[in-house]
């Protein structure tokens, strides 16, 4: 799930309101939902970036990508 700028703005708005005057029960639930969606999006983006990394030994020029990562890349069609 990708998070939109509007959702990030709403997260920030709820955080400011919580500090200033507190949140209703519905707003607390909305805040928790939006925060979880934001964290899930960040984790998915990070995982996607890590899964595309290829590690090369500087001295030998050999591919030293960990086997576990190579397997994930094969599964996703990024390796032979």
Swiss-Prot record:
GO terms for cellular component: cytoplasm. This is UPF0291 protein LACR_1198. Its main location: cytoplasm. Keywords: Cytoplasm. It is found in: Cytoplasm. It comes from Lactococcus lactis subsp. cremoris (strain SK11). InterPro entries: DUF896 (IPR009242). Coiled coil: none annotated. Pfam families: DUF896. Belongs to the UPF0291 family.
């Amino acid at each position: 799930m990708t998070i939109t700028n509007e959702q990030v703005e709403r997260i920030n708005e709820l955080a400011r309101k919580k500090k200033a005057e507190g949140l209703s029960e519905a707003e607390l639930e909305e805040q928790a939902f939006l925060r979880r969606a934001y964290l899930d999006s960040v984790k998915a983006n990070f995982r996607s970036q890590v899964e595309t990394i290829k590690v090369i030994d500087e001295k030998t020029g050999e591919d030293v990508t960990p086997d576990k990562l190579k397997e994930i890349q094969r599964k996703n069609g990024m390796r032979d």
